[in-house]
Amino acid sequence: FSVMPLSLGSFRIGIHIAAPALGIEPESALDKIAAARLSTVYLPGNKITMLPDSIIHHFTLTENRLQPALSLYLDVSDDFTVIKCESRIEKIRVATNLRNNSLEQHFNDLALNKGGFEHTYSNELSLLWKFACKMEAQRGKSNDNNDKIDYSFEIKDDRVTISERRRGSPIDKVVSELMIYVNTEWGKQLTEAGITGIFRSQANGKVKMSTSPAPHQGLGVSQYTWSSSPMRRYVDLINQRQIIALLRKEA
């Protein structure tokens, strides 16, 4: 993510997604590998990636590297209302990759309840947090995973270490809400342009995938595409191609 101050207390949020669709052609050898695997599989202490490691390294938004990205920019007023959206295909240079385990030492509920925290990006993180809270309230939905616990497994010298992490931290909410926003907005753009996408919807507790947009009751949005994880889900890679075609006026 990026945050840029604008005039009169407003600011611009950038949601930047790695863009492997710019380099993986449909029906190419790499595309066939991704299509066969469909998604990354996560196992205790290991994972089987959808794409080869060399391709992941090539397209990952790593700090201090100029990388291709599909970005959504939101111009946000001082009351955290979105007043403008713009999608771009671009190259970006990431200043810093922030990691959850180190970030949560500073950016947590306790620090926010005290009114602030010390971090190089404390101002940007605080703005993103307030924006995420506003977006969650607008959807009329809260994160149902707050009380769930994730476990990570590490194997070293034949010894297994299990660590637990409770979901629902401030950084979880920021990432979740901005991903919901970008997937909803890109789904809206595809719908308005009459371009086919793969949509995820929910009604009466049943979730389905379809090429026709429909409301997602669980998230409280009018339409929702999977498009924010094109490195680990094939559906997202397909949708990213459609969004790129829309922006390039190729569809």
For each feature predicted by the language model, list its residue ranges:
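Electropositive polyanion-binding surfaces
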Residues: 1-251
